[in-house]
């Protein structure tokens, strides 16, 4: 390609492109062709930069090589970069370092920074954090924005220098003010965390916003986080979703996952679960563990996609391979239940242990349950209690309830109803329905606490309104008998109905009694018999006995001594 340069001897504009009407540097209108003999090193650097921008890497390498041969520092640096990236030449870190060192010795700031990077990461030279910081410092003295940012990172982390967050903030600020986007991002984080400066969410958001204006994916994502959580601005779900989408379109996996959550839940956008699955999939395929987990849940539950245990197991396994605690837990549950995989409680235990080792209380609780039942492990109440206690002390409500039950019935510990009530209370305070019901039982009968029937009813109601069948039955009984509340047969029958339809055998029995006696409902012996039979099939002895009486007395048709005897025997 033919070379032309500006006729003006003071102007060094040179190009292989089509000759412009006017020189972009001096405004001159005349250009001269060149065979290269009249060009100086700086001209070859300019031509190399032009060739590199055009993607003509072979030409760029040749141009930079000419400049470097004349000892031009910029040419040496750019030739070193070609060796680093393998553009126009075979990639070679040692050659890159050699050229960076030559240029750095002449004071070229870019080369000094590049050489520092090589030392920091051991590219072409032995790793040497102190040498890295020293070269970053040389370049930073010349106000090179990238070097200022790199040196700031060293001061942030104490890499090659003593940690000095305040100095880091100073350097990030200089670099950010010069327009270096990574420095803007890092400075925002320092303000957000209050490291090296007073915590200032407004300043953090301002710097993230400036970086986001340059389409920096991570900064866009962080803006989304700030608007979602109300850091430095009022909570704005719609604006958060906009930032997530912009970052997601740049293929930033965490943003893809967060935008998917917005779509799945309808937070800040119109709910669209199938589209959420598409975004989860994009992030999951990039290896984002949280997205892999969320995608697995979608496949397990059939949310936004047809239910598929195979895909659920695949994505739980992918996230578990990255040691995501919740994925380890859910995959363990699949193995424990045989959902989508062959039932394998031993494998479940291994997965639960990996999750528990990362501090996941729910996993400790599952381990406790395996030992309680002797499922895949030798049955051991003391071991079960130990795991329940670890999870309970971490504030996990189901484990607190389980530990309370162990104390109430003396399983793995000495029976202690007061301790039982304490642990039930901790779980009940978190709104855990089973614990509310158990604590209600304690108050109804004065077990471990002073008898307080109104408090019992209050707790039963809280659990019953969450749909717990046992609590619905207990509330129905209190309402029927006027225990801790005014007697109300109709309300009692309604609570028994809910309990019975929820599959609780005692609720079925009590509902049958209502129909037998006309308590709160119209007397109906046929319905009474149906509910007694359902309760009996669930294994409730009282229902079996009642059916025996009915068949013996002929309440449900002709007397049938054989049927009566069969139910009595059961």
Give the role of each language-model region.
Residues 39, 69-73, 85-87, 92, ...:
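Short helix-capping/linker turns of helical repeat alpha-solenoids
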Residues 7-15, 27:
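Cys/His-coordinated zinc-binding microdomains
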Residues 3-8, 20-21:
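Residues immediately within or flanking Cys/His clusters that coordinate Zn2+
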Residues 44-51, 78-85, 114-121, 150-157, ...:
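Hydrophobic face of amphipathic alpha-helices that form TPR/SEL1-like repeat modules
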Residues 14-22:
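Short linker/helix segments within small regulatory modules
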Residues 27-36:
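Short Cys/His-rich micro-motifs in 6-15 aa windows
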């Amino acid at each position: 390609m033919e070379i032309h340069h500006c006729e003006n001897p003071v102007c060094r504009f040179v190009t292989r492109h089509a000759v412009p009407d006017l020189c972009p540097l001096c405004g001159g209108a005349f250009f001269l062709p060149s065979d290269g003999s009249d060009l100086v090193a700086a001209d070859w650097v300019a031509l190399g930069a032009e060739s590199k921008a055009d993607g003509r890497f072979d030409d760029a390498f040749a141009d930079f090589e000419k400049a470097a041969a004349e000892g031009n520092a910029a040419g040496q640096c750019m030739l070193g970069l070609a060796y680093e990236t393998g553009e126009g030449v075979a990639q070679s870190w040692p050659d890159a370092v050699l050229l960076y060192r030559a240029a750095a010795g002449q004071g070229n700031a870019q080369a000094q920074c590049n050489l520092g990077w090589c030392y920091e990461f051991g590219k072409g030279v032995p790793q040497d954090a102190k040498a890295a910081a020293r070269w970053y410092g040389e370049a930073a003295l010349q106000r090179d924005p990238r070097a200022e940012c790199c040196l700031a990172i060293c001061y942030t982390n104490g890499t090659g220098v003593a940690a000095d967050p305040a100095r880091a903030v100073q350097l990030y600020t200089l670099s950010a003010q010069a327009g270096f986007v990574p420095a803007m991002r890092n400075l925002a984080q320092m303000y957000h965390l209050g490291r090296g400066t007073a915590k200032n969410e407004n300043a953090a958001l301002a710097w993230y916003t400036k970086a986001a204006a340059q389409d920096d994916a991570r900064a866009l994502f962080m803006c989304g986080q700030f608007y979602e959580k109300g850091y430095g601005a009022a909570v704005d779900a719609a604006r958060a979703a906009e930032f997530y989408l912009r970052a997601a379109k740049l293929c930033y996996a965490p943003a893809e996952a967060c935008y998917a959550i917005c779509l799945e839940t309808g937070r800040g956008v119109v709910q669209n679960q199938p589209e959420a699955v598409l975004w989860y999939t994009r992030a999951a395929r990039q290896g984002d563990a949280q997205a892999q987990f969320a995608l697995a849940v979608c496949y397990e539950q059939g949310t936004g996609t047809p239910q598929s245990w195979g895909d659920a197991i695949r994505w739980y396994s992918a996230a578990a391979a990255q040691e995501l605690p919740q994925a380890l837990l859910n995959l363990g549950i699949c193995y424990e239940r045989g959902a989508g995989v062959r039932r394998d409680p031993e494998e479940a235990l291994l997965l639960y242990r990996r999750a528990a080792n990362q501090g996941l209380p729910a996993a400790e609780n599952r381990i406790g349950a395996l030992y309680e039942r002797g499922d895949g492990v030798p049955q051991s109440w003391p071991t079960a209690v130990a795991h329940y206690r670890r999870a309970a002390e971490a504030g996990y409500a189901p484990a607190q309830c389980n530990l309370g039950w162990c104390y109430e019935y003396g399983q793995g510990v000495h029976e202690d109803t007061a301790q039982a009530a304490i642990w039930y209370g901790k779980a009940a305070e978190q709104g855990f329905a089973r614990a509310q019901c158990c604590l209600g039982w304690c108050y109804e009968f004065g077990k471990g606490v002073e008898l307080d029937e109104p408090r019992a009813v209050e707790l039963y109601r809280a659990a019953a309104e969450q749909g717990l069948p046992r609590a619905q039955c207990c509330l129905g009984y209190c309402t029927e008998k006027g225990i801790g509340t005014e007697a109300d047969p109709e309300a009692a029958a309604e609570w028994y109905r809910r309990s019975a339809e929820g599959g609780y055998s005692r609720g079925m029995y009590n509902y049958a009694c209502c129909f037998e006696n006309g308590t709160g409902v119209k007397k109906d012996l046929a319905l009474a018999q149906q509910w007694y039979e359902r309760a009996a099939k669930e294994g409730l002895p009282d229902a079996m006995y009642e059916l025996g009486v009915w068949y013996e007395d002929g309440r449900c048709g002709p007397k049938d001594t054989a049927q009566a005897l069969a139910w009595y025997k059961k």
